[in-house]
Amino acid sequence: MSQEKKVFKTEWAGRPLIIETGQLAKQANGAVLVRYGDTVVLSTATASKEPRDVDFFPLMVNYEEKLYAAGKIPGGFNKREGRPGEDATLTSRLIDRPIRPLFPKGYRHDVQVISIVMSVDPDNSPEMAAMIGSSMALAVSDIPFEGPIAGVNVGLVDGELIINPDVQQREVSVLDLQVAGHFDAVNMVEAGAKEVAEDKMLEAIMFGHAEIKKLVEFQQSIIDEIQPVKSEFVPVEVDADLESKVEQLSESFGLSQAIQTQEKLAREENITAIKLKVIEAFEGEDEAVITAVNKKFDALIKEEVRRLITEEKVRPDGRRPDEIRPLDSEVGILPRVHGSGLFTRGQTQALSVATLGALGEHQIIDGLGVEEEKRYMHHYNFPNFSVGETGPIRAPGRREIGHGALGERALLQVIPDEKEFPYTIRVVSEVLESNGSSSQASICGSTLALMDAGVPIKAPVAGIAMGLVTKDENYTILSDIQGMEDALGDMDFKVAGTKEGITAIQMDIKINGLTEDILREALEQARVGRLHIMEHMLSTISEPRAELSQYAPKIEIIHINPDKIRDVIGPGGKKINEIIDATGVKLDIEQDGTVFIGSSDASMIEAAKKLIENIVREAEVGQIYMATVKRIEKFGAFVEIFPGKDALVHISQIALERINKVEDVVKLGDQFLVKVTEIDKQGRVNASRKVLLEEEKKASEEK
């Protein structure tokens, strides 16, 4: 890597983009500083000196958010950043996916790409700056890399597509799309959308790719000037005779027939049996030979699966390319929860459970941006037993977080506004069985659970995972991919949406990129599959239940004068805590005076409502109230006309005749009717007993 500082400038979506090399992190294999407006990200790439003896590429991508970038001090006792938050984890995945396919096949050196956000400008995406920085750090290093790549955000505001929308534009955009790729093709897509049609989504993807091309050209100009020297990578030589023998043995033992076993576990058992027979033929050979045999056998499985799909249009389980596995679904299978849905597609099964809570139970997101409140959450769990394996039970990893976020994006678009449905909603999807497309099964199960819970979603959402197998110029697009097709194919393209359009998509590929034609065909085939799945789901439950579960909290909304909010809360929260302690309800008060009262006990809601109404109740001039004497002074008596509201009855207004002492007529605790005669500018209430006595005397005389 060059040790001389160099600065390169261009414009990106109307804002300055600056890439600096040669000054920072000079012991990394590659490092760049990316400035996009006032957003600054340091990206580094480092590789191990020697390769690892593993059968996968050990790439680790880390995106780190430093709170100093936003002028914040971390909370907690230590005042340090802790483990990455969910957004940082998702961004790490976002960067990983487009760069992973661009390393040489068989490369086994550990590679770590780290992007540290050092300054953040809300209008200029640190995520996209980190993606460019990661690409450039690899490109200027000696690490073999077939980039550069770039990524952009695309919004859709009033029918117009926008590159890298600012904060205000993002708030009104019906599309939140991230696209990445190299000059020739797109290789990563992630989006949340408000029922955007397939043709508009494709237009947005290609619109983003046009901008990506400009960024790639800019990066290439930097590479051409720096001229990094790449380390030589020589793939491990293969033993042609050994591979030929493995191929012949596998064919003779019926590998192709074993691959076409319909049931997953039986297929795995049949393939394993053949593998053991092949290994037996090499009995007595050293470990290196057995490793080579295993590697070739796995390669043969991949080749045969791909051949069957591309040439014979037959999938391992016998389905046509566009055929969806058998579907089954149920709702309401758990008696005490607020809503539940079980969705099964072939050998993939997800149980989703919906829980409703008060608005105050929302999740607070305090990252680099403005503090946000999240009232809809979707969590995805993938236990070992779902694939018939054992292992330690750990906290959710990147995959679980990513799949949960995808499901959240897919359904967030149809969740009703809090004014219409004043609840915090959490859905947990437990994958009970998996043979591919489990994230999409969790979306379908979550829709069922929400409808079972009585959440008035705007429209049901279904999800499907599409696959792709390419061979030379030919390709086959697969609907509803299973695990083997995901592992051995070229694409995992997840599409979720309603009947009207897409609400979320996520695309990962293992080849360099996809053309516009393949994307168009995949989106259309996904639409047809999604509608087929939707039809089945609606046959199970056609619309959200009219009533909530008896175990769900009931929430009543009342409106108070915003000026009275402080009275309800009281000094230091004293008043509101008294109400909560007395009734056990959950209270949430909005700045506009909207009060949400939640409890599973309707009588307690009513009790809390009365307490609040008494606090905010306004006295009215001319109204008559039953008053209770609370305090006596020389100049009059202070009476309570209703809970929380006192009035002064002046000594001159207590009796018909003139009195010398208040105590001569009334005592503490006495009750009598008074009429409110005045409310001054400070809100103090004056009342009269005398006025009512005069009216009573007059009425008596008239009789």
UniProtKB/Swiss-Prot annotation:
Its cofactor is Mg(2+). One of its GO terms (molecular function) is magnesium ion binding. SUPFAM superfamilies: Eukaryotic type KH-domain (KH-domain type I), Nucleic acid-binding proteins, Polynucleotide phosphorylase/guanosine pentaphosphate synthase (PNPase/GPSI), domain 3, Ribonuclease PH domain 2-like, Ribosomal protein S5 domain 2-like. Transmembrane segments: none annotated. The keyword Transferase applies. Mg(2+) binds at D486, D492. Residues 622-690 form the S1 motif domain. One of its GO terms (biological process) is RNA processing. It is found in: Cytoplasm. Keywords: Cytoplasm, Magnesium, Metal-binding, Nucleotidyltransferase, RNA-binding, Transferase. Belongs to the polyribonucleotide nucleotidyltransferase family. Involved in mRNA degradation. Catalyzes the phosphorolysis of single-stranded polyribonucleotides processively in the 3'- to 5'-direction. This is Polyribonucleotide nucleotidyltransferase.
